[in-house]
Amino acid sequence: MEELILGIVQGLTEFLPISSSGHLAIFTAIFNSTPDVGYFAFLHLATFLAVLIFVKSEVFEIVNGISKKDNEYINLASKLVLSTIPAVIVGLCFGDFIESVFSSTFLIGVFLSITGILMLLSDKLNQNLKTIKSIPYLDAMIVGIFQAFSVLPGISRSGTTLFAALFLGMKKEDAVKYSFLMGLPVTFGAGILELQKVSFSAEQLFGFVISFLTGLLGLYLVKKMVIGGKLKIFGYYCFLASFFVLMFL
């Protein structure tokens, strides 16, 4: 039952800007069990597949453009790679510290508050000038730096990258696409690195499937909420979750 619940939590919260890692750690604390970082990473592979399906047309365009040596798509792919570098460096260099943070409900509560603030601010950003193809390399690096902070449980990956992209003047729909696309290698890498720690029990595999299905639902919801200018709803939720964690866990 625990694996099923964690699968649902991972699928829904991976793309909603409320921090999937933070919620997995919270529910683990509620279950009074030891955080299984390996299983958490395994669930990331499920949501990786979900987002790959969700942005399959964009991925196909990029791959097709690169094969035809189209500079526009080569530059876009280069920017996406650049955006992933900070998170990769942080994950490799500070993996043990990050794993220890999963056991600190106090820090998770604080980080959820930070995510909440970013979501409230995001709704006020409406420059809507740049597309995923037109953003400069510097912007790609800045968005990547924001993503690097999301290795901490409670800091939302989609939340930080959406905030950064919108702050830098990207159109809302393009900000969503860029956030999902740049998250593909990070999410895949996180799952692969910890795969050897997974026992592949029937319960864990079922949790994987559930995480994939609920991930598709989460992707639809976040796209609709960003375009509709309703990110503040997630901000209020993060504040409530933070209060609950700090007061009761």
From Swiss-Prot:
Keywords: Cell membrane, Hydrolase, Membrane, Transmembrane, Transmembrane helix. It catalyses: di-trans,octa-cis-undecaprenyl diphosphate + H2O = di-trans,octa-cis-undecaprenyl phosphate + phosphate + H(+). It holds the Pfam family BacA. It is found in: Cell membrane. The chain crosses the membrane at residues 11-31, 35-55, 80-100, 101-121, 135-155, 175-195, 202-222, 226-246. Its EC number is 3.6.1.27. InterPro entries: UppP. PANTHER family: UNDECAPRENYL-DIPHOSPHATASE. This is Undecaprenyl-diphosphatase. It comes from Methanococcus maripaludis (strain C5 / ATCC BAA-1333). The lineage of its organism: Archaea, Methanobacteriati, Methanobacteriota, Methanomada group, Methanococci.
